[in-house]
Amino acid sequence: MELKKDINAVSIDMLLIVHSEKRRAAQGTLSDQQANPSSLLQRGGGFQGVGNGVRRWQKLEGNDFHENLVEKQHPQQPQVITSYNSQGTQLTVEVHPRDAMPQLLKKFSLAKRLQGDKNGNTRPRQPGGKDAHAYPWDRSSLKSMSLDLQQFEKLDIYASQVTAKSGLDELVSDLLQEAHTDLERVRAIWIWICHHIEYDIAAAQEKDRQAFKPTDILRTQKTNCDGYAGLFERMCRLAGVQCMTVPGYSKGFGYQTGQSFSGEFDHAWNAVYLEGRWHLVDSTWGSGLVDTITSKFTFLYNEFYFLTHPALFIEDHFPDNKNWQLLKPPQSLRQFENNMYHKSEFYNKGMLSAHPETSMIRTVNGKATVTIESCAPTLFMFMLNGKQEHGLLSLRKNGMKLEVYPPTMGTHKLQIFAKGNSDIYSSVLEYTLKCNYVDMGVQLPAELHQPVGPSWFSEQMGIMKPSHPDPIIHTSDGRCSISFSVEEGINVLASLHGDDGPITEETQRRYIFQLHREKQTELKVQLPHAGKFALKIFVKKRQEPGNYIFVFNYLVCCANTKVNWPMFPESFGNWGQDNELLEPLSGVLPANRNVPFKLKLHGIAKVLVKGQDTWPLTLNHEGYWEGSCSTAGCQEVYVMVLENANHNFYSYILKYKVNAQ
């Protein structure tokens, strides 16, 4: 219908209400309480059964090691469609359940209308082309607009400390005391909600869903995702900032890789209008997390969900209206279901991309490879079916590489965790791994921990310039020698681990002999048999108390079944870090032989080798103590030293066994 301009014409907002029996049947009849005009939204909080009675849950982003969770909510947002003719006449159509109060009628009854923009418009405009951001993400920023978070420090502190003394109007007024732009107003509201409103776990567990009113939220300081979104919208409107609540699907707890979404929406968030464009926020996921073990909410602020770049927001938020994706091109529901889900901590910890880019991956010849690119050095770990086994994870300067070898055919769960400056690893990625072939030739030692091979982290811990930069060492004769520079004041400890049954901690170190030459450390390794071994490297600051810290390990492989090397000699506490043994290196000496000895010791007055008899060693011009001793008639041979020439007390430093005749 065309309306001609006339001086006597009257502008009329026409409301057409269309009842859908299918929509009503799918969503159910709302209660009288939910239809209350004072309700923020025509939907309840908490969780409800879905289909076969399985409950949906919503994860409050925060990503602790236990995958902390809360329940998903089910928005039932009415559809509002607005069209304009060439003369500017507006027709608004709303589709909603039969027994629900129309949203537009409720808006007409509000005592306070949304403050208009400069053009006098009272209703927020729908998103258009100028709001859209390019997809995929261009890596330019985690935010949809340029922000300097340091400029918010004073405002954030102020907003987080404001208390709700009475009503919502006064609260918003107090928050705006230090906010002078629309961006600062939105920031103050966001910070206050994220630091004061906790997720209402008890309400979420009730069978009857309830609508959360702003007055109730302020009184209890609790709500669900509907309440978070509704409160954020209401406070923004009171502050004169255009804001909308957006319902849709989300990838929270309970989400299974590759799952399909249908039926009722399970989450709600907000779009806010700033500097001529729409932007996205989720105060529910910005506020904290719920621990699955204790079922307690913990405030854990997550900056990621404030003005998130739409190309990142779409990874776990799919709106009911594709225009609210704010993307060009928009993603389909099928794409949303199939796309890789990078959790917020993936980006919070500086990661940029992961390969493969699909959440479902298959092994090739029994192996799957995952790589991650990051903008800064980051520590990683992984779990395959809940265990840190069957994989080789090597750190790179800007990321990591993981090779996984599933031990059985079938479907496996692969989780990847990352750690920034904190001491807590956070879940950042999850893959579903399908394996149709097992490489029986790959049997990794159970004691092979992560990471494998030297990296920026080992340099940071004082180990530099390794002779073997690769994580895997192959030896044909069962022996190898590894050397590296060691930072001043750092002690190094190494141990060898196989899968041939339990062995003592002492035995684990007896197949490694450690030599020190100035700032250079050499590890001589002899394998007891063929197989795969984990060579673990530990460090400790010499002047500090405490235990040695694990840094990395090598995977040492030998296929020669004839290998059967004995242990190295046993060393005692007086064997110094800078001592050097040239011979004999075998810890087991032949019987009835004269065995040559040669070693370098520092600060020693005399050296003796004691078998059945005692033989002195002499100091040559190169600084080595050398000589020989007979193994006849003895089972053990000791090397003893006298540190002070004025004393007669000798200390044992090395012990050898003699083969039985």
Swiss-Prot record:
It comes from the Eukaryota. It is an enzyme of class 3 (hydrolase). SMART domains: TGc (SM00460). Keywords: Cytoplasm, Cytoskeleton, Hydrolase, Myofibrillar myopathy, Protease. It is found in: Cytoplasm, Cytoskeleton; Cytoplasm, Myofibril, Sarcomere, Z line. Residues 28-47, 115-136 are annotated as: Disordered. Residues 28-41 have a biased composition (Polar residues). One of its GO terms (biological process) is proteolysis. One of its GO terms (cellular component) is Z disc. Highly expressed in skeletal muscle. The keyword Glycoprotein does not apply. Its EC number is 3.4.-.-. Its main location: cytoplasm. It is linked to Myopathy, myofibrillar, 7: A form of myofibrillar myopathy, a group of chronic neuromuscular disorders characterized at ultrastructural level by disintegration of the sarcomeric Z disk and myofibrils, and replacement of the normal myofibrillar markings by small dense granules, or larger hyaline masses, or amorphous material. MFM7 is an autosomal recessive form, clinically characterized by early childhood onset of slowly progressive muscle weakness and mild atrophy primarily affecting the lower limbs, associated with joint contractures. Belongs to the transglutaminase-like superfamily. Probable cytoskeleton-associated protease required for normal muscle growth. Involved in function, maturation and stabilization of the neuromuscular junction. May act by cleaving muscle-specific proteins such as FLNC. This is Kyphoscoliosis peptidase. It comes from Homo sapiens. The lineage of its organism: Eukaryota, Metazoa, Chordata, Craniata, Vertebrata. The gene is KY.
